[in-house]
From Swiss-Prot:
Residues found modified as N6-(pyridoxal phosphate)lysine: K34
Pathway listed: Amino-acid biosynthesis; D-alanine biosynthesis; D-alanine from L-alanine: step 1/1
Gene3D superfamilies: Alanine racemase, Lyase, Ornithine Decarboxylase, Chain A, domain 1
Matches recorded under NCBIfam families: alr
Disulfide-bond pairs as recorded: none
Gene that specifies this protein: alr
EC category name: isomerase
Protein name: Alanine racemase
Needed cofactors: pyridoxal 5'-phosphate
Originating organism: Hahella chejuensis (strain KCTC 2396)
Gene Ontology cellular-component annotations: cytosol
Length: 374
């Protein structure tokens, strides 16, 4: 059996969400598990968060359906909203699906479906959040449309408007002028909304960690919940977070190189002295980035070392000159507790988000719960 695998530590996940809950103080957490929980496995993560997060957030309705069909009953916030009236109509078979309204055309779709929902208990009504564009200019309504959209939505007897939200573009930067402008714009939106009983949500992971004034009623932690940092100059450990994913494999060969010997495709690395190298059974076919630079950190037998040579589809090579105990079968950590995903990502000119979500189906996820493999 190929040795590459991703260990998903559900105890670390619970540690992180509890830490984030404590930072959020009185705000509640809508835990973001879109994109298969950032590559960690959405169903398993959702189950582990039961009792820890009162709401889960996904990108699209398909992700919501997968969770409901797996028996997950936690309320689900669909961040991209609905794409069609057909999606809306189909969603009537589920309870506690919360939609984001971010575009005027969505009102026409709602007008076809919302009247079919009768006024009743909150769990049976179609629930919506209004998204305000405060400067990211991706999704969201302008402030001057807020009153009109709110009035239209409230005309549907089977629909409840439950909140106003926005999304920050530069919350990972301290003293960002755009962050300040977006926050002021959202404050204006809250003031315009008035005393209507709505909830308010603006903080992603970065804002949760750096801008406490933005916490409001609901925070939406994503990457931080998985133990990585949204800030380029910090790691998850700097905030007391624990890595949830450990990506590991094993050595399948070792070799002694002489000065002048090169390794792999393109002869991208040449030894300038005698070097003992190891071949690891992992590559870009597993999601380890091909663009990873020479010198990227890994750990062999728990000791830090570096990649040498180009990453292949199924293999990569590492320097084990200073690890005499390394041999075929020795464990290799690509990222995890010894080598952080935040650090590794920098050597590929990317971010930890892409490392996690880019892991392919060839890599089995193995879950650890209460310190036991499940």
């Amino acid at each position: 059996m190929r040795p590459s695998r991703a260990l998903i530590d559900l105890d670390a996940l619970r540690h992180n969400i509890r830490l984030l809950n404590s930072i959020a103080h009185n705000a509640r957490c809508a835990a973001v598990i879109k994109a298969d929980a950032y590559g960690h496995g959405a169903v398993e993560i959702a189950r582990a968060l039961k009792g820890e997060a009162p709401k889960l957030a996904v990108a699209c309705y398909d992700e919501a359906v997968s969770l409901r069909e797996a028996g997950v009953t936690t309320p689900l916030l669909v961040l991209e909203g609905f794409y069609s009236s057909e999606e809306l109509a189909d969603s009537t078979r589920w309870c506690d699906i919360e939609w984001v309204v971010h575009d005027m055309e969505q009102l026409d779709m709602l007008s076809e479906v919302a009247p079919l929902r009768k006024a009743g208990p909150d769990s049976t009504r179609m629930q919506t959040w209004i998204k305000l564009n405060t400067g990211m200019n991706r999704l969201g309504l302008p402030l001057n449309k807020l009153a009109h959209v709110a009035e239209k939505l409230q005309q549907f007897p089977g629909l409840s408007v439950i909140g106003l939200m926005t999304h920050f573009a530069c919350a990972d930067e301290l003293d960002s002028l755009l962050q300040q402008r977006q926050w002021r714009a959202f404050q204006a939106g809250m003031q315009a909304a008035g005393a209507n009983g709505w909830s308010y949500s603006s903080a992603n992971s970065a804002a949760l960690l750096q801008y406490p004034e933005t916490h409001l009623d609901w925070v939406r932690p994503g990457i931080a919940m998985y133990g990585a940092s949204p800030m380029a100059d910090k790691t998850g450990a700097d905030f007391g977070l624990k890595p949830v994913m450990t990506f590991e494999s094993r050595l399948i060969a070792t070799r002694e190189l002489q000065a002048g010997d090169s390794i792999g495709y393109g002869a991208a690395w040449t030894a300038d002295a005698p070097t003992r190298m190891g071949v690891v059974a992992v590559g870009y076919g597993d999601g380890y980035p091909r663009q990873m630079q020479n010198g990227a950190p890994v750990a062999v037998c728990g000791k830090r070392t570096k990649i040498i040579g180009r990453v292949s589809m199924d293999m990569l090579t590492v320097d084990i000159s200073h690890i005499p105990e390394a041999r075929i079968g020795s464990e290799v950590e690509l990222w995890g507790g010894t080598v952080s995903a935040d650090e590794v990502a920098g050597y590929a000119s990317t971010i930890s988000y892409t490392l996690f979500t880019g892991m392919t189906s060839r890599v089995p996820r193995v879950y650890i719960n209460r310190s036991e493999v499940v």
